[in-house]
Each structure stands twice: as C-alpha cells, then as structure tokens.
Amino acid sequence: MNDRLFISALRLLPKNALSRAVGALTRWRAPVPVRVAAIRAFARRYGIDLSECPDLDVYRTFGEFFARPLRPGLRPIAPGERVVASPVDGAVSETGRVEAGRLVQAKGIDYPAAALLGDEALAARFAGGAYATLYLAPKDYHRIHFPLGGRVTGWRYVPGKLWPVNPASVRTVRGLFALNERLVTVLETPLGACAVVAVGATVVGRVCAYYDPSIPFTNLPGAAPRRHDYETPIPVEKGQELGAFEMGSTVILLFEPGKARLDPRLAPGVRVRVGEPLGGAA
C-alpha cells in the first residue's frame, strides 16, 4: 500500500477513540502467564532487547512494559552542563533551524512553531534557533529524559488528533506534529530556553510527565488546551526522567537562537540513544 492510500484509509478510523480503547486494554491486569507470553511475542515482533529490562513478571500490565525502565547503568549521560544529551532512544527525523517561524517536517513539508507549541510568544523565543525531531519506534525504550539540567518553568498541553507518526505519515500528513496531541515542557538551562515537545500518536494511550504528578494524563475525551507557568520553577538534572509514552512516538527539541549547535552528523535516519551527545553550545 502506498503512502497516500495508507493515509486515506486512516482518515476513516476514529483514531482518538481507538487509542483510548487500546490504552485501556494495555492497562488490563491479565494473568501473569498471558501477560508474559504477550510481552515476549511483542518483543519478538519488534526486535526488543529484553536483556535491558527487569524480569518480565514484574510488569502488572502490558502498558507498564511499554513504559518500562531500563537496568541501571545502560544509558550513560554525556558529561558537561552545556552538552545536549539525547532525551530518548530513537532515530533522527529532521534537524535544522526555525526559519520564518517554521520547522521542516519532511522534504517539501514544513509547519509553524507557534502551532506546534500552542503559544505564539513562546514560539518567538525559538525563532532562528536549532531544533531536532526524534522518532521512537515501537521497539524503542519509551521514557523521555531531560536533555540538559536546569529548571522547568512551565508546560503547555495542546489537544489534537492522534495520527501515526511513522515515516509514511510524516511524508504525507501536512503539519502532522502540529495536528497531533502534544505536551510541551519548557526549561531554562545553561544554553538558555529549551522546549521538549512530546507528540502523541495512534495507539499511544497516554503521555505522562514525571516532574509534576498534577499534570493530567493526555488523550482524555473533550480535553481543552492548558498551560501552566510555575511561580517556583522545578529544578531538574540532565538525564533525569521527564516522562514516558505508552507506545512509540516523537520528541522535538527546540533551542533559543545562538545558544545551541547540533552535531551536523545527525542526518535523518541516524539512531541515537538516551544520554548520547547531540550537540553543545553554539
């Protein structure tokens, strides 16, 4: 099936409702033998390295496996307070600079930063700055880590659709990352302001943030846009867990102009892992 036929078929599906249904199923506490067998089958299908995970019988639900932690010490964090560490395991989708207020999604397709962030004033801070888009496949570790140390100054929740974010969708659905539901975490770091955008996708049941338990789970029926700026920002360390997806999706990093420089070797398709250096001070 070519990309356009695939997307046309997806337009007919109730993607948000489907994602909520799948999410509910992944939170079902099936008997341990059933749960472990399902996890092993999923791992074989997608090539997941189970040696990185705790014993499979510790997961109470399939969803807990999706958002699994890793064994300690498997993802060393690149040292240096001005070195940007990868927040996720995944593949580079695009990197570049925010030009004329827009980011590149794929060849011939771009979209506005203001729509992505749900905040024009916030988007203006990143005009001319570097950005990186990182795609998490179903096989990848699904937790998100802070790329730099600093303070969380606020967040934005933008409800939306739940299109897939696989390469076929990225090539075909215009403005995909500004259409899908997303959670934006805003940081002040040694490299200035940084936004970490967690973009939802089909059958990504929820995106959750660990730094503030009061932030609501995403993908709730009838959700409205929300924003919060902290009177007392939350201190965080580089490599600390920010949150998690319950399936694969996409994370987008944005930086202020003249502050951060990304490694030019980060071409589309290059694999990265949590903690690996993505760049540093401009």
Swiss-Prot record:
Function: Catalyzes the formation of phosphatidylethanolamine (PtdEtn) from phosphatidylserine (PtdSer).
Primary location class: membrane
Record-level Gene Ontology MF annotations: phosphatidylserine decarboxylase activity
Name assigned to this protein: Phosphatidylserine decarboxylase proenzyme
Keyword line: Cell membrane, Decarboxylase, Lipid biosynthesis, Lipid metabolism, Lyase, Membrane, Phospholipid biosynthesis, Phospholipid metabolism, Pyruvate, Zymogen
EC number(s) stated in the UniProt entry for this protein: 4.1.1.65
Cofactors, names only: pyruvate
Record-level GO BP terms: phosphatidylethanolamine biosynthetic process
Enzyme class: lyase
Reactions catalysed, as given in the entry: a 1,2-diacyl-sn-glycero-3-phospho-L-serine + H(+) = a 1,2-diacyl-sn-glycero-3-phosphoethanolamine + CO2
Family classification: Belongs to the phosphatidylserine decarboxylase family. PSD-B subfamily. Prokaryotic type I sub-subfamily.
Membrane topology: Peripheral membrane protein
Disulfide pairings: none
Cofactor note: Binds 1 pyruvoyl group covalently per subunit.
Modification(s) after translation: Is synthesized initially as an inactive proenzyme. Formation of the active enzyme involves a self-maturation process in which the active site pyruvoyl group is generated from an internal serine residue via an autocatalytic post-translational modification. Two non-identical subunits are generated from the proenzyme in this reaction, and the pyruvate is formed at the N-terminus of the alpha chain, which is derived from the carboxyl end of the proenzyme.
Residue positions, PTM Pyruvic acid (Ser): 249
Origin superkingdom: Bacteria
Active site: 89, 145, 249
Annotated site residue numbers, Cleavage (non-hydrolytic): 248-249
Subunit comment: Heterodimer of a large membrane-associated beta subunit and a small pyruvoyl-containing alpha subunit.
Compartment(s) of residence: Cell membrane
Pfam families attached to this UniProt entry: PS_Dcarbxylase
